[in-house]
Amino acid sequence: MIKVFKTNISDRKSADRVIMMLEDGYPEFMITIDTEDCDNVLRVQGHSMFSAEGIMDSILIMGFVVEEMY
């Protein structure tokens, strides 16, 4: 399963911090953030089903804006 999100995570330091936090909760997932894309795209890929809301809640708690892209 792959989910893609639009974020306001625009710098590498913040992206690395968010990725580390998400990897703690989802260690088996592949997680990337493209800070050079205009939408600062977060891509989460896992072998099992997962909730977009869980990912979004974690990012919102860190103070960032996130929106699932369809």
What are these model-derived regions, one by one?
Residues Y26, N40, G63-V65:
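Short, highly charged low-complexity linear segments
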Residues K6, D16-I19, E36, H47-Y70:
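C-terminal structural segments of small proteins and small subunits
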